[in-house]
Amino acid sequence: MDVLYSLSKTLKDARDKIVEGTLYSNVSDLIQQFNQMIITMNGNEFQTGGIGNLPTRNWSFDFGLLGTTLLNLDANYVETARNTIDYFVDFVDNVCMDEMVRESQRNGIAPQSESLRKLSGIKFKRINFDNSSEYIENWNLQNRRQRTGFTFHKPNIFPYSASFTLNRSQPAHDNLMGTMWLNAGSEIQVAGFDYSCAINAPANIQQFEHIVQLRRVLTTATITLLPDAERFSFPRVINSADGATTWYFNPVILRPNNVEVEFLLNGQIINTYQARFGTIVARNFDTIRLSFQLMRPLNMTPSVAALFPNAQPFGHHATVGLTLRIESAICESVLADASETMLANVTSVRQEYAIPVGPVFPPGMNWTDLITNYSPSREDNLQRVFTVASIRSMLVK
């Protein structure tokens, strides 16, 4: 894996800097590095593909070295270099694709394709060893079963979940009280609602709670907490739990009271925030508990009182909500996030070449399925294919 990254880094630098008119002295170190790559690769043969519709390709290396000059690089010099660069880039691209479409239930962190296994040989270590990528650094740590750490922005840590629970329900669905939520990606939105606006609740207060368990522990997280759930702020028709009918949700938004958010690890509270909104932080956690209250207003103008009558029919529904958004965090496991395209890169290649479903990943690389059942085998394989995708993205956009 290190060699593949070093190849890609060398080729990217060469493609960007070996251009017509450049002083040789400005790129002499790069050209020496490029020549070392050629010397190491010459005389070797590789085969890639042969799975799904990914075609089998054979690769052989027999390239001349780039010479020295006292002047600027001319068109002939650059054309010779470009021909070599283009072949190597095509080779690296195909090695990456070959690796991204393979998986294994055992030791999925290790190279799975024959081409990458061959590149892992000791003789290829002479290719300007470069370990500066976060993915490569963590791949090496995971390969040695040491602790890893990935920094994510808006990590896709929450499997998609959208539903509701009713704490009070009638067959006519005309006087309901409960909680509805939408968990997806890095965001939780939860709303508590009461058709009667807590008129019969103790002290005219309804208590709501929403607990979300993460599939992986997050550390040093920066989080935004807002006293609103905009996705539940407009009317909608909702299917009943048994699917036999539908009911009408017509919210009027109130501000939540006594808001508390707890971050827990293995059942122990690590951080607690009460009535604090905006930016908050959490040290390390695997569970989030949100609790908040709907309080019936003590004093109401006639127009507000008309929204919340003392008896049925209830035409509007008192609603309070929260939004919790993980802006950034560190995780020992690899995740998809908002700043990278690794999941899309891997998925698109597997779809384009009709790669058959293997023993590890779900069909279509369904992220909700993958993160919901994030087994050690999936973790190893995902870290490997994401590392390869990060290498490929250096050369192929």
From Swiss-Prot:
The N-terminus is blocked. Zn(2+) binds at residue 153. It is found in: Virion. GO terms for molecular function: host cell surface receptor binding; metal ion binding; structural molecule activity. One of its GO terms (biological process) is fusion of virus membrane with host plasma membrane. Gene3D superfamilies: 2.60.120.170, Viral capsid alpha domain. Residues 62-73 are annotated as: Interaction with the inner capsid protein VP2. Ca(2+) binds at residues 266, 286. GO terms for cellular component: viral envelope; viral intermediate capsid. Keywords: Calcium, Capsid protein, Intermediate capsid protein, Metal-binding, Ubl conjugation, Virion, Zinc. It comes from the Viruses. InterPro entries: Capsid_hemagglutn (IPR008980), Rotavirus_A/C_VP6 (IPR001385), Virus_capsid_a-hlx_vir (IPR008935). Homotrimer. Interacts with the inner capsid protein VP2. Interacts with the outer capsid glycoprotein VP7. Interacts with the outer capsid protein VP5*. Belongs to the rotavirus VP6 family. Intermediate capsid protein that self assembles to form an icosahedral capsid with a T=13 symmetry, which consists of 230 trimers of VP6, with channels at each of its five-fold vertices. This capsid constitutes the middle concentric layer of the viral mature particle. The innermost VP2 capsid and the intermediate VP6 capsid remain intact following cell entry to protect the dsRNA from degradation and to prevent unfavorable antiviral responses in the host cell during all the replication cycle of the virus. The VP6 trimer contains a zinc ion located at the center of the molecule. The zinc ion is not essential for either trimerization or transcription activity of the DLP. Zinc-depleted VP6 has an increased sensitivity to proteases. This is Intermediate capsid protein VP6.
